[in-house]
């Protein structure tokens, strides 16, 4: 392959060693041509090899080996020698094809390719429209309309198989009548956005179709989870390298894990003997905390009456003095205080409880401190905002949902525990068909016995892939942007007569809570009658909003307050123009109320 005649570009370096990569002899250009003539993946391999290897003979040998290996790839390989023919769409009559005609059916390769190309086309069209602001957030229909069936779309299940043509119609219509939660004008929930890297990770996760209980069947995913959880514990600020954690089906289950861990830590006999073997235990949480704490109290046998609610100030933060008073009151009544939940980012107000002061009280009375940072945990990634979670490193356990502020696709929630071994001890049942101690690898990587589930979905890959793609700094920028948009919204409406803030001062999180005041109620003194009328405003606007499909934002009451809008921003695709649109849309829909 090599030429003995130097090219004009290299003639001035004729005395140099031609076997080094400091020069670009004609052979180098020849190899680059070979690389460019190959499929993309193979070409990248060759180019990477050219950058690393100095020997001309070795380069020639390896290029030939690559091409020989390439010739052995089958039809479905992404490295087929003809890039254009790999997955070329052809006219296919899906009305006469059924699931049984796809792989693993004999000669099912072509039908499988064509069917999946149609599905990918549906998916890509949906993704494109999701980021198109001229597309509606939703095409709203009432439940009875969908249950009765739309044209070509029927939810009822049949005894006999339907054609792939109908299956493709069902795929399109399912997305059509759903809500575009990735739309830049969807502000209804804490989990929003459509991250493309995360989407790719979720595709591949489903393709792998494995389970997280043992290293044996999910080796790479188990290691990814271990590495990611370790990184999250470091970000929390735990110096103990032997902490623990697991990904769970959501923040409610993560919070339940924290209560189970606390109970096992102080009363391990509960695992075998039940609640009858322990004293009358009580839990403490704020009146603004997530309802999952009370739900866990019910599910775990404490009873909701033994989940004691702590008063909050006007911003929705725990009042530490009330916490201590209620701990003392419980002790005086013969109860045993066990656990305190502090919230970092409440669901409605976005408030951050004073963790340092709560931690002092927990240390004083030897209580387990859990921080529910499902919503606010993402702020730990931001050097500008992580101070709002000051003291979180003193917690015994933390819930952190990357599927909220970090924009990871649902579901992705972690329960992190400072002390290693508690999750295992609490939940381990040593099922012999899964967790054999004499396997050929280190069985400490079999994490399934930490979980209350048996089968556990792979939630880690999309998150790990996003972290690789963005880096910690990318997440930081994304989170800072969302908080800046919340500040923009607050500044835009705080002094306008059409709007009234639910509480004074700038928001701590991206939660901006406000009332829209229609013309008929402006300047009207506060009274029960005015509050009753105001209570009906947000639901009416929300109903009109859903009918028009232009945007979505949530509303709710809080305590004795009338229904108000709770705006939350977690979608990095949102911009100031989307905030402006929301304000204008609320005014437009509410002008005649």
Curated annotation (Swiss-Prot):
Residues engaged in binding 4-aminobutanoate: 189-191, 566
Keywords on record: Decarboxylase, Lyase, Neurotransmitter biosynthesis, Phosphoprotein, Pyridoxal phosphate
Top EC class for this record: lyase
Superkingdom assignment: Eukaryota
Database matches in InterPro entries: PyrdxlP-dep_de-COase, PyrdxlP-dep_Trfase, PyrdxlP-dep_Trfase_major, Pyridoxal-P_BS
GO cellular component: axon; axon terminus; cell cortex; cytoplasm; GABA-ergic synapse; inhibitory synapse; neuron projection terminus; neuronal cell body
A Pfam family assignment: Pyridoxal_deC
Reactions listed under catalytic activity: L-glutamate + H(+) = 4-aminobutanoate + CO2
GO MF terms held by the record: glutamate binding; glutamate decarboxylase activity; identical protein binding; protein-containing complex binding; pyridoxal phosphate binding
Keyword Phosphoprotein: yes
Residues with the Phosphoserine modification: 77
Modified positions (N6-(pyridoxal phosphate)lysine) in chain numbering: 404
GO process annotations (BP): cellular response to hypoxia; cellular response to serotonin; gamma-aminobutyric acid biosynthetic process; glutamate catabolic process; locomotory exploration behavior; positive regulation of locomotion involved in locomotory behavior; response to auditory stimulus; response to caloric restriction
Spans annotated as Disordered: 1-22
Tissue: Expressed in brain and pancreatic islets.
Ranges of Low complexity composition bias in the record: 1-12
KW Lyase (keyword) present: yes
Cofactor (UniProt): pyridoxal 5'-phosphate
Function: Catalyzes the synthesis of the inhibitory neurotransmitter gamma-aminobutyric acid (GABA) with pyridoxal 5'-phosphate as cofactor.
Family classification: Belongs to the group II decarboxylase family.
Subunit structure of this chain's protein: Homodimer.
Identification of the protein by name: Glutamate decarboxylase 1
Gene source species: Rattus norvegicus
Name of encoding gene: Gad1
């Amino acid at each position: 392959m090599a030429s003995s005649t130097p090219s004009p570009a290299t003639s001035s370096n004729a005395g140099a060693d031609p076997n080094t990569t400091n020069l670009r002899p004609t052979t180098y250009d020849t190899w680059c041509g070979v690389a460019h003539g190959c499929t993309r993946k193979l070409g990248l391999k060759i180019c990477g090899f050219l950058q690393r290897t100095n020997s001309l003979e070795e380069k020639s040998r390896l290029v030939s080996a690559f091409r020989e290996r390439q010739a052995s790839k089958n039809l479905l390989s992404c490295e087929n020698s003809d890039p254009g023919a790999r997955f070329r769409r052809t006219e296919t009559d899906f009305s006469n094809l059924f699931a049984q005609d796809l792989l693993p059916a004999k000669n099912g390769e072509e039908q499988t390719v064509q069917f999946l190309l149609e599905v990918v086309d549906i998916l890509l069209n949906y993704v494109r429209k999701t980021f198109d602001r001229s597309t509606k957030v939703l095409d709203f229909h009432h439940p009875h309309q969908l249950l009765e069936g739309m044209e070509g779309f029927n939810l009822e299940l049949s005894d006999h198989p339907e054609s792939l043509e109908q299956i493709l119609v069902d795929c399109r219509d399912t997305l059509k009548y759903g809500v575009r939660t990735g739309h830049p004008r969807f502000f209804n929930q804490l989990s929003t956005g459509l991250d493309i890297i995360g989407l790719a990770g979720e595709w591949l996760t489903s393709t792998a179709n494995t389970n997280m209980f043992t290293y044996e069947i999910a080796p790479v995913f188990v290691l990814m989870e271990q590495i990611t959880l370790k990184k999250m514990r470091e970000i929390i600020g735990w110096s103990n390298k032997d902490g623990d954690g697991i990904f769970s089906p959501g923040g409610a289950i993560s919070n339940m894990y924290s209560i189970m861990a606390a109970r096992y830590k102080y009363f391990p006999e509960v695992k075998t003997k039940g609640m009858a073997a322990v004293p009358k235990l009580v839990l403490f949480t704020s009146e603004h905390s997530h309802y999952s704490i009370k739900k866990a109290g019910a599910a775990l046998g404490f009873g909701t009456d033994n989940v004691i609610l702590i008063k909050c100030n006007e911003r929705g933060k725990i009042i530490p003095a009330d916490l201590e008073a209620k701990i003392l009151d419980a002790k005086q009544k013969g109860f045993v205080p066990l656990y305190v939940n502090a919230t970092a980012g409440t669901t409605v107000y976005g408030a951050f409880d004073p963790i340092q002061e709560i931690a002092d009280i927990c240390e004083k009375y030897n209580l387990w401190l859990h921080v529910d940072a499902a919503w606010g945990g993402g702020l730990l990634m931001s050097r500008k905002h992580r101070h709002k979670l000051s003291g979180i490193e003193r917690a015994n356990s933390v819930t952190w949902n990357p599927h909220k502020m970090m924009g990871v696709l649902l579901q992705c929630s972690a329960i992190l525990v400072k002390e290693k071994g508690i999750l295992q001890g609490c939940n381990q049942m040593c099922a012999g068909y899964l967790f054999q101690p004499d396997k050929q690898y280190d069985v400490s990587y079999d994490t399934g016995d930490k979980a209350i589930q048996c089968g556990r979905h792979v939630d880690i890959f999309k998150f790990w892939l996003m972290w690789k793609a963005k880096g910690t700094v990318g997440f930081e920028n994304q989170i800072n942007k969302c908080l800046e948009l919340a500040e923009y919204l607050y500044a835009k409406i705080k002094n306008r007569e059409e709007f009234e803030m639910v509480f004074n001062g700038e928001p701590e999180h991206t939660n901006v809570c406000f009332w829209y005041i229609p013309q008929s109620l402006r300047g009207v003194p506060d009274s029960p009658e005015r509050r009753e009328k105001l209570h009906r405003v947000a639901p009416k606007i929300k109903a009109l909003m859903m009918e028009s499909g232009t945007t979505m934002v949530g509303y709710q009451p809080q305590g004795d307050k009338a229904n108000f809008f709770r705006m939350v921003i977690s979608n990095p695709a949102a911009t100031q123009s989307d905030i402006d649109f929301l304000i204008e849309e609320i005014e437009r829909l509410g002008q005649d109320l």
